[in-house]
């Protein structure tokens, strides 16, 4: 675990998806809970439950996989960390990038909490671009 909890979440999910693991365990923080809610709402993960072990809270995520055995396995999730502790990236609502022409999701940290690019455009607020998911 590093000091960048968002990068830890993204790396854990990406590694589990790459090795076809169906369950991922990530540390439970306010930021991770907000990001996981967005992933669940957008359909990138199937299920979330809270788990407590040795006085530490964890989120147990069930990933969504393609179940086609005829073709080679391809990753379903593509996640990329954008703003990081060494280089923060901010955007106003007009310049929030569209991922795959609107098919992907941009997660932003705004003054009203963590939200997707669509929600930020509707509320006309910008913020720090945390990550891309497609």
UniProtKB/Swiss-Prot annotation:
Under the heading Pfam families, the entry gives: Ribosomal_S8 (PF00410)
Cystine pairs annotated here are: none
Keyword NADP attached: no
Which keywords appear in this protein's UniProt record, sorted alphabetically?
Chloroplast, Plastid, Ribonucleoprotein, Ribosomal protein, RNA-binding, rRNA-binding
Q: Which PROSITE patterns match?
A: RIBOSOMAL_S8 (PS00053)
Q: Might you name a Gene Ontology BP term for this protein?
A: translation
A single GO molecular function term of this UniProt record? rRNA binding
Going by the entry's taxonomy, the superkingdom of the source organism is recorded as Eukaryota
Please give the InterPro entries that the UniProt record associates with this protein.
Ribosomal_uS8 (IPR000630), Ribosomal_uS8_CS (IPR047863), Ribosomal_uS8_sf (IPR035987)
Per the record, its GO cellular-component terms are: chloroplast; ribonucleoprotein complex; ribosome
Where does it localize?
Plastid, Chloroplast
Physiological role: One of the primary rRNA binding proteins, it binds directly to 16S rRNA central domain where it helps coordinate assembly of the platform of the 30S subunit.
User: Which HAMAP family does this UniProt record tie to the protein?
Assistant: Ribosomal_uS8_B (MF_01302_B)
The text of the family note is:
Belongs to the universal ribosomal protein uS8 family.
Q: How does this chain assemble?
A: Part of the 30S ribosomal subunit.
**Full protein name:** Small ribosomal subunit protein uS8c
């Amino acid at each position: 675990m590093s000091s960048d909890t968002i990068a830890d979440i993204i790396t854990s999910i990406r590694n589990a998806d790459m090795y076809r693991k169906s369950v991922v365990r990530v540390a439970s923080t306010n930021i991770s809970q907000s990001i996981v809610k967005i992933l669940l709402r957008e359909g990138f993960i199937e299920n979330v439950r809270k788990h407590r072990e040795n006085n530490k809270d964890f989120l147990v995520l069930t990933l969504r996989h393609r179940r086609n055995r005829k073709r080679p396995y391809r990753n379903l999730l593509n996640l990329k960390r954008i703003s990081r502790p060494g280089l923060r990236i901010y955007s106003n609502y007009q310049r929030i990038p569209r991922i795959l022409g609107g098919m992907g999701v941009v997660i932003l940290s705004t003054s009203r909490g963590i939200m997707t690019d669509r929600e930020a455009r509707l509320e006309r607020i910008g913020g720090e671009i945390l990550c891309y998911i497609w």
